[in-house]
Design a protein with these regions (language model features):
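Extended two-metal-dependent nuclease catalytic cores across DNA- and RNA-processing enzymes
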Residues: 1-177
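Short, amphipathic C-terminal "tail helix"
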Residues: 180-182
C-alpha cells in the first residue's frame, strides 16, 4: 500500500531485515562521491553506527529529537562486546544459545568490558566475531548488498499526485496539513 501511494522508494529483501537495507543504502551513498542526504527515522540504537557517515542523520520520533553519537566506531565495538538483548544478541562472555535456553547471560561488568577491549579468550573472540556479524551493518553479505543496491537504483516511487488521495482516504489530517514536507 505504501509502495503504491507514497512518493518514496520502498525496498524489501527476503533475506534482509530493514536495518540491513538501511545500512547498505547508507554505505552505498558513500560511493562515487554521491553523499546523498540520508535521514533515518527511528529510535533504534543500532543505527548509531551509521552516524560515522557525515551525510547520515537519525531522528527519533519517540523522543522527538535527533540522535547523536560522538564516537560511532566506539559505539559499534561496545555494542558488539555487550550484545543487544532486544535483538537477542548475547554479550561475548555468553554462549550462543543463552536466550533460547532461557538462561542468564554472564554479567558484563565494567571491568570485564575493559578487559574484552584488549584481550579475549578463544571463545570470547569467536563470540566477538559472531556478534560482529549480527550487529555490524556493514557485514551484510555481498550478494544481498548487490540485490539491495540494484533494487534501490531501479525501483520507481509512486507519483506524487497519488499521495493526497491516499492521505484523504486514510483520514491522515496531520499529514495532509504537512503535505508540502513530503
Amino acid at each position: 500500500e505504501i509502495r503504491e501511494n507514497v512518493p518514496y522508494k520502498v525496498l524489501q529483501h527476503e533475506r534482509a531485515e530493514a536495518d540491513d537495507i538501511i545500512g547498505v543504502i547508507a554505505e552505498y551513498t558513500q560511493q562515487f562521491g554521491r553523499h546523498d542526504d540520508v535521514l533515518i527515522l527511528s529510535g533504534d540504537h543500532d543505527f548509531k553506527q551509521l552516524l560515522k557517515y557525515s551525510n547520515v542523520r537519525q531522528f527519533s520520533p519517540m523522543q522527538k529529537k535527533f540522535v547523536e553519537c560522538k564516537d560511532p566506531a566506539g559505539y559499534l565495538i561496545e555494542h558488539i562486546i555487550k550484545g543487544d538483548k532486544g535483538d537477542e544478541v548475547p554479550n561475548i562472555l555468553s554462549r550462543d544459545d543463552v536466550f533460547v535456553s532461557d538462561e542468564r547471560q554472564v554479567v558484563m561488568t565494567a571491568k570485564r568490558f575493559e578487559a574484552c577491549l584488549t584481550e579475549r579468550t578463544v571463545d570470547q573472540e569467536r563470540n566477538y566475531q559472531r556478534n560482529e556479524t549480527l550487529v555490524d551493518l556493514s557485514k551484510c553479505p555481498q550478494d544481498i548488498k548487490d540485490d539491495i543496491i540494484d533494487s534501490f537504483e531501479t525501483v520507481i516511487p509512486a507519483p506524487r499526485g497519488k499521495l493526497m488521495n491516499y492521505l484523504v482516504k486514510k483520514r491522515c489530517k496531520q499529514l495532509i496539513d504537512s503535505i508540502g514536507e513530503f
